[in-house]
Amino acid sequence: MTKEEAWRVLEECRRRIDELDLQLLETLNERTRVVEKIGQAKQVLKLPIYEPKREDQVYANVTGHNRGPLPAESLKRIFERIIDE
Protein backbone atom coordinates (compact mmCIF):
# COMPACT_ATOMS: atom_id res chain seq x y z
CA MET A 1 0.00 0.00 0.00
CA THR A 2 1.35 3.39 -0.94
CA LYS A 3 1.10 6.43 1.31
CA GLU A 4 -1.53 7.88 -1.03
CA GLU A 5 -3.59 4.70 -0.78
CA ALA A 6 -3.15 4.65 2.98
CA TRP A 7 -4.44 8.23 3.26
CA ARG A 8 -7.44 7.33 1.09
CA VAL A 9 -8.20 4.27 3.23
CA LEU A 10 -7.87 6.36 6.39
CA GLU A 11 -10.31 8.98 5.14
CA GLU A 12 -12.81 6.39 3.88
CA CYS A 13 -12.70 4.53 7.19
CA ARG A 14 -13.16 7.75 9.15
CA ARG A 15 -16.20 8.66 7.05
CA ARG A 16 -17.64 5.20 7.65
CA ILE A 17 -17.04 5.51 11.40
CA ASP A 18 -18.85 8.86 11.37
CA GLU A 19 -21.82 7.20 9.64
CA LEU A 20 -21.82 4.31 12.11
CA ASP A 21 -21.62 6.71 15.06
CA LEU A 22 -24.76 8.47 13.84
CA GLN A 23 -26.52 5.13 13.47
CA LEU A 24 -25.48 4.21 17.01
CA LEU A 25 -26.79 7.53 18.27
CA GLU A 26 -30.15 6.96 16.59
CA THR A 27 -30.37 3.41 17.93
CA LEU A 28 -29.41 4.44 21.48
CA ASN A 29 -32.05 7.17 21.50
CA GLU A 30 -34.68 4.74 20.20
CA ARG A 31 -33.68 2.24 22.90
CA THR A 32 -34.02 4.96 25.54
CA ARG A 33 -37.54 5.78 24.35
CA VAL A 34 -38.50 2.10 24.65
CA VAL A 35 -36.95 1.90 28.13
CA GLU A 36 -39.03 4.92 29.17
CA LYS A 37 -42.21 3.16 28.00
CA ILE A 38 -41.23 0.07 29.97
CA GLY A 39 -40.73 2.24 33.05
CA GLN A 40 -44.19 3.74 32.65
CA ALA A 41 -45.77 0.30 32.27
CA LYS A 42 -43.92 -1.00 35.33
CA GLN A 43 -45.19 1.93 37.40
CA VAL A 44 -48.78 1.14 36.45
CA LEU A 45 -48.22 -2.55 37.16
CA LYS A 46 -46.37 -1.73 40.40
CA LEU A 47 -43.38 -3.80 39.28
CA PRO A 48 -39.81 -3.09 40.37
CA ILE A 49 -37.84 -0.97 37.91
CA TYR A 50 -34.67 -3.02 38.31
CA GLU A 51 -34.82 -6.70 37.41
CA PRO A 52 -31.42 -8.42 37.61
CA LYS A 53 -32.71 -11.47 35.71
CA ARG A 54 -33.75 -9.30 32.78
CA GLU A 55 -30.36 -7.60 32.76
CA ASP A 56 -28.71 -11.03 32.61
CA GLN A 57 -30.99 -11.94 29.69
CA VAL A 58 -29.88 -8.82 27.81
CA TYR A 59 -26.21 -9.72 28.32
CA ALA A 60 -26.80 -13.32 27.28
CA ASN A 61 -28.70 -12.20 24.18
CA VAL A 62 -26.06 -9.79 22.91
CA THR A 63 -23.09 -12.00 23.71
CA GLY A 64 -24.86 -14.99 22.18
CA HIS A 65 -25.38 -13.11 18.91
CA ASN A 66 -21.90 -11.57 18.85
CA ARG A 67 -19.83 -12.78 15.91
CA GLY A 68 -16.81 -10.62 16.75
CA PRO A 69 -14.32 -9.18 16.53
CA LEU A 70 -15.55 -7.48 19.72
CA PRO A 71 -14.76 -9.77 22.69
CA ALA A 72 -17.76 -10.88 24.76
CA GLU A 73 -16.43 -9.26 27.93
CA SER A 74 -16.00 -5.91 26.15
CA LEU A 75 -19.51 -6.18 24.76
CA LYS A 76 -20.87 -6.89 28.23
CA ARG A 77 -19.10 -3.82 29.66
CA ILE A 78 -20.54 -1.66 26.88
CA PHE A 79 -24.05 -2.89 27.60
CA GLU A 80 -23.55 -2.42 31.33
CA ARG A 81 -22.86 1.25 30.60
CA ILE A 82 -25.87 1.53 28.27
CA ILE A 83 -28.17 -0.03 30.87
CA ASP A 84 -26.77 2.13 33.68
CA GLU A 85 -27.57 5.29 31.76
Cite the ranges covered by each PLM segment.
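Domain-level signature for soluble enzymes in the chorismate/prephenate branch of the shikimate pathway
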Residues: 1-85
